[in-house]
Structures are given as C-alpha cells and as structure tokens.
Amino acid sequence: MNSNFRSLMIWGLIALFLIVLFSFFNGNRQRASNGEVSYSEFLQKIDNNELKTVTIQGQKLTGQTADRRMISTYAPRDPGLVQRLNTNKVNIRAVPESSGNSIFLNLLFSLLPVLIIVGAWIFFMRQMQGGSRGALGFGKSKAKLLTEAQGRVTFKDVAGVEEAKQDLQEIVDFLREPQKFQRLGGRIPRGVLLVGPPGTGKTLLARSIAGEANVPFFTISGSDFVEMFVGVGASRVRDMFEQAKKNAPCIIFIDEIDAVGRHRGAGLGGGNDEREQTLNQLLVEMDGFEPNESIILIAATNRPDVLDPALLRPGRFDRQVVVPNPDVAGREKILEVHVRNVPLAPNVNLRVLARGTPGFSGADLMNLVNEAALMAASRNKKVVTMQEFEDAKDKVMMGAERRSTAMTQEEKELTAYHEAGHAIVALNVPVSDPVHKATIVPRGRALGMVMQLPEGDRYSMSYLWMVSRLAIMMGGRVAEELKFGKENITSGAASDIEQATKLARAMITRWGFSDMLGHVAYGDNQDEIFLGHSVARTQNISEETARMIDAEVRRLIDDAYKTATKILKTQNKQWLALAQGLLEYETLTGTEINEVIAGKPPSRTQGSDTAPLRTSSVPKIGAKNSKGASKSGDAEETEPSVGTKATAASSAKKVVKNASAKSAEKKASGTQVKAATPAATSIKATSAKVASAKAETENVASAQAATENVAMVKAATANVAKKSVESAQADDAEKKRLEEHNKSAHNKKGNLTAGAASNTEDEK
C-alpha cells in the first residue's frame, strides 16, 4: 500500500511539474511574440504620445500603452532618449540591470527537458528491474542476505529427514570448527545439491543450516540471473561471489538451480544463449583458477536429470543429498512441529494421522494442519478435534465437496453403482489396499470416488498388486454395463481407462511383465528438445514390436475386465446393497462399507451426518459392539475366587445350562465359568450339600448377569464365598484340595466340557 501510494505521488509531482513548465514557456513565448518592436517604432510611439510609462533596464526598454499593452525593444547608446521622454511627458521607471542569473536561468530552461527525459528513463528502468541500484545496477547480484529479522530456523524446526540432517551437520561443524577437519587433511564439500520432490523441505533445510552455523547466508533464485540484457547473468554471478568473499565464511543458496543450470547445447537455432553464458561463469566461480575456500554453495532442485554434467561433478557439487517424502515416523514428527501453536483436543492422535497419510510431503502435512485449524474455527470450536483432521485429510486427498452441484436421480444412481463396483472389486481381489472411503458427493472434478489408503509406505509393487489394481479400475465400467446395459454406459470411466492403460503399458514396456516381450525395456521417445538432448534420436522399437506391445496392453486390460465382471456377478448382493447404502448415506467409510454389505446399518452417532472417526487404513483396536470379546477380556483380568462345595455346585448348575446351549468356541467366556471350573471336578464329593447352598443361587445369578462389570463380579463372588464358607462344614483336607485345584484351573480351560457333562449326569 505504501509503495503504491509513493509511486502515485511521484507520478503526480511529475505531471504537475510538466504542467507548470509548459505554462511558463508558453507564456514567455506569447509575451515575446506580442511585445517585440523595433527601436524606431518605439521612438515613433513616444513622439505620438502612445506610451504612458517606459521602464529602462540597461539596454532594454519596456513601454506601456494607454490600453495597457506592453511593448519592448533594445536601445542603442542614445544620450537624448531621456530628454525625448521628458519632452513627451512619459513616466520614466529605471530598474537595475540583472546579473548573471539570466544566463543561469536560460541554461537551466534549455537543459531542463533533457534532464526530465533522463530522469523518467532511470525511473522506468528501476521499476522494470525491481529496484536495481541505479541505472547501472543491472550487473549487480540480486542475492539477499538473510538476517535474524526474517526468523531464525534451526534443525529443531526440521523433522522427518534425519538422514539429510546428518549429512548437512558436517557442513555446520566445518563452519564452526574448520581446524577439526583441516588437521586431518579433510576438505569440506564445496557444493551440496539438495534433490527431492516438491514440498519435502529443501529450502527449509538450507535455512536451518544458516541458523545452526550462524554465518552470513545469501539466498537467490535461479531465475534471478538471466534478464533482458546480454551479459547480465554472468555479471551477477561474479558480483555474487565477490560479496560472498567479503563475508567469508558464508553460505550461498540457489533455489531452483535448474532454471540456470540446464544441460548446455539445448534448443534449436544458432543464436546466443544467455543462460549458457551464465552457467559457464557459475562453473568457473565454483571451481576455477581462483579458489573460493570457506564459501559453500547449496542448491535445491526437483529436476536433477536436466542439470549439466559439468555442474554435478566432484569439486563443484561434491555431495548430493536426497530429501524424500517422510515415512510414518517422519510424518508424525512433522505433525508435532506444525501443531505446536494449535490447541488440540484430547482425542487427537498424531500417530494415527501419520499412518493415514502415506505419501504426504512436509508441505502437505502443513496444509493438512492448517485446513483442520480453519475448519475448527469455522465451526466455532475452541480446540481442533480428530474430526477436523479427518475432514481436512479428505479435503486434501479427494478435493473439496461440491454439494451445490445439481445431479439428477439417474446420475446419482449411476454414480452409486459405479463407485460400488470399484469398492466391491477392491474388497475381493487377491491383493489390494484397504478401502478408506466411498462417496457419491462430487469432490474436485469427480462426481464420486472410492479412496484407498495403503496400510504402510510402499516402495515397490508386485505383479499381483498391479493386476488387482487394473481390475479395481475396471470395476466402475463393469458395474455400469451389468446394471444399465451395454448401450447405457457413460463416459464416467474415462479417468479409470486412462489410468489403467498407463499402468498396463508401464507393466509391459518398463517392468518386463510380459512373457511374449521378455525382460526388455521398450521406452518411448519422450525426451524434450529443450532438456539438452539431441533432437534426432533413433527409435529402437519396430512396428511389429509396437503392435505386440499394444496387444499385450489390451490383453492385460481385457483380463482385468473379466476379473471385475466375475467378482461383481459373484458378489451381486453385496454390490447392490452397497449401492443402495451410498444412495442413502452418500458417504461411507471402510468400516461402514463392511457393515452395509453385511446387512447392518452403519454405526453412526445420532444427529450427526459425519462418519465416525475410524478408517480402514487405521483400524481401531477391538470391536465396538462385540460383547463376547469384552467379556473374555474382563474374565482374563479377574482371578477365580475360592468357593465352597455348595457354592461351586450351585454355580455349576447355572453355567452348565449356558455352556450346553453355546458353541465350544465360547469356552471360559465369563467369570462364573471360570469359578465353576474347580467345582466341576468336585461335584460328586459335594452333592450332599447342594440343598444347603440353593439359598445362595439368587446371589450367584445376579453376579452372573453383571459379568461386564468386573468389580461387581468380584464383590458378588466374594459374598457368595463368605456365606458358603460359613454354612459349609467341610474338613480342612477338602478345603486344601479345592484351593490347589482353583490355582491350576487358569491353565485348564479344556476341562470345561468334561466337567459340564459330569455335572449334567449328577443333576439327572
């Protein structure tokens, strides 16, 4: 705002000055053209009494007529002029003659237009060059010195790239203690090239080196060298290294060096390439006749394949540090860095988020945290919950929802069956990533989608996985054909077909997955002219081989189509159920998809349109509605109580009735079953006291009904044991035998069936 206002003020002052100057020159010219007369005419007007006043200024005479018109002339040396004026009764005014100011003003007025033109040219060039230092500042380096005011970044602010940090730590140590390395004859790398995909933190790593080493740090972009004038790029490279030598030891960071370091000899035509001249100067400065010790050049690029080989050789870029996408542990650390200033709810689990975001870069994770914070603020929440993180993850991965898109019922049905086909095939192929979410709500440029998330980071793909992936891609088109007929299929599978063709061709031409073509790479000629490669390259694929490649690609896709057709016909009920579920709920998570195809409604919280916070890629531990599992877990934590014969007998009667009705898989599923285990072996010896223990049956039944509450079971069992001990008159040997048997009953769950059978016989 200030710079715009300043520019506006400058333009306004220039315009005002030009207007005043024009008025001044124009007025003088008009006055000069209207009042100039000859000396004879001036004398004649005096004699004719036409002049009322005459002003004498040296040799200049200025007269005023009766009608107030001004005339002027230059008089020679005329001694009788004053007498003549007095004779004609003319009012005489004498003005002292001016000094050399008139000469100066005349010179100024003559040079002023030239000065204005030169000033305007300088102003325009400064604007075009982005504020270069003066009109002759084109060749000056545009490298900026990073200061503390711009924020100090250290290695603590960089996470997820531990190997890269270790490689760069040596540079920091050298800048701090150069004698440590020089004592053993070591030489620090003169240049370090950071290579990695976009968003992995290459620039942040460079800034952290400057913060750790505490040395001057110059930063410049690769596009800041070459501009409109010839020779500017090379001049800026020289000036940049001259500034670095004055501030040595220091670091120079060139971001996106591929803009200036591309392979030489690229392009068509024989004209001069300013970029090549700049690159040559950079090569000389990095490793030429003049050594540049204590100057470390760090560069970053995501296109190392297009760089000139001379730039990558040892002595210039001695070390190449790869900065890949982070793994699970790295993503968790990156999330911890980005949530430092974000208030989180207690249910936020960064480990779960890291597992559910495979392939995310550091920039993607930063965007994820920012989107979650914005969603929480728009929902008027004081903290960011796990729901916001899940919604933000879906928005980043699948695109923003477009619920305003008007879709007809026919389009919704077609989309639902299409996406259900993808999901059912994904659930039934041999190898596949878990289904994370299926939706028919338009997101991004798609009307619907099925999202799959791998359970972990994948670094290689198997043949079976690729074939299964092809079948999943064909699932949507197969579903349309089976449901609506071949004549009613739509263009909705265009993206699926394109991706399937690309994958199948890569399987044949790059990865050798064809028995007919063998383990040979048949790469297409995709090299671009301006990447420094030769224009004319021979294609090593014959027409017959090209036809074979097309046939093999067609075969893989046809096989995938048949596989998808077979799966959807076999799992027809599940497919139809899932399609109806999508029409009803619009969006289903992986867990909800399994519930829908099993004939159950999705377990969602009432009054909420959103899905529960769980995904198939990050499953929850334990089942939510599995009562048997929860009972068995409680039973394992509860120790069996010591009961008397009467208590054991009454407990055995209750448990045996349940055990005979249940399957053998639910052995030892409750606390009462465990408590009945020692009783089952001693039921014959205690049958005489069964009648006296029947009074405690109600207490045991109430304890059995409360098996989910471990504390209540323990209290009820202790109460039963206490009352049974008081009523029982067993001898000490019998009690000792029962206690020993109870201790060993934990590891003898298999005796339940035999004990239950003996109990049944005794009861009869």
UniProtKB/Swiss-Prot annotation:
One of its GO terms (molecular function) is ATP binding. One of its GO terms (biological process) is proteolysis. Residues 1-6, 124-764 are cytoplasmic. Its cofactor is Zn(2+). The active site is at 419. InterPro entries: AAA+_ATPase, AAA_lid_3, ATPase_AAA_core, ATPase_AAA_CS, FtsH, P-loop_NTPase, Pept_M41_FtsH_extracell, Peptidase_M41. Acts as a processive, ATP-dependent zinc metallopeptidase for both cytoplasmic and membrane proteins. Plays a role in the quality control of integral membrane proteins. Homohexamer. This is ATP-dependent zinc metalloprotease FtsH. It comes from Bartonella bacilliformis (strain ATCC 35685 / KC583 / Herrer 020/F12,63). The gene is ftsH.
